[in-house]
Amino acid sequence: MASNASADVTTMTFERAIEELESIVKRLEDGKVPLEESVAIYERGETLKRRCEELLRQAEARVDKITTDANGAPVGTEPLDVR
C-alpha cells in the first residue's frame, strides 16, 4: 500500500492533510475497519494532525497587525496577538 495512502506528510498542504485526516476520522467513527488497520490509520492521523498544527503555527507567525499613528495612518506592523 505504497500509494497516496503513504504519501509523504511533510510535503502536504494544510488542505490536503486536513482532508485526509477528516477521512480517517470518518473511517474510525464508522467502526468497520479491522483492528490492525485501525491502529495504522490512527497513527497516520496523528502524523497528519501534527502536520496541520505545524502549518498553522507557520501561518500564525506570518500574520501581522498593522500599527497606526495618532491620526490613524499606517506606520508599520507588529506581530498579531490573538490571545
UniProtKB/Swiss-Prot annotation:
It is found in: Cytoplasm. The keyword Nucleotide-binding does not apply. GO terms for molecular function: exodeoxyribonuclease VII activity. Gene3D superfamilies: Exonuclease VII, small subunit. GO terms for cellular component: cytosol; exodeoxyribonuclease VII complex. GO terms for biological process: DNA catabolic process. Its EC number is 3.1.11.6. It holds the Pfam family Exonuc_VII_S. Disulfide bonds: none annotated. It comes from the Bacteria. Keywords: Cytoplasm, Exonuclease, Hydrolase, Nuclease. It catalyses: Exonucleolytic cleavage in either 5'- to 3'- or 3'- to 5'-direction to yield nucleoside 5'-phosphates. Belongs to the XseB family. PANTHER family: EXODEOXYRIBONUCLEASE 7 SMALL SUBUNIT (PTHR34137:SF1). Bidirectionally degrades single-stranded DNA into large acid-insoluble oligonucleotides, which are then degraded further into small acid-soluble oligonucleotides. Heterooligomer composed of large and small subunits. This is Exodeoxyribonuclease 7 small subunit. It comes from Afipia carboxidovorans (strain ATCC 49405 / DSM 1227 / KCTC 32145 / OM5). The lineage of its organism: Bacteria, Pseudomonadati, Pseudomonadota, Alphaproteobacteria, Hyphomicrobiales.
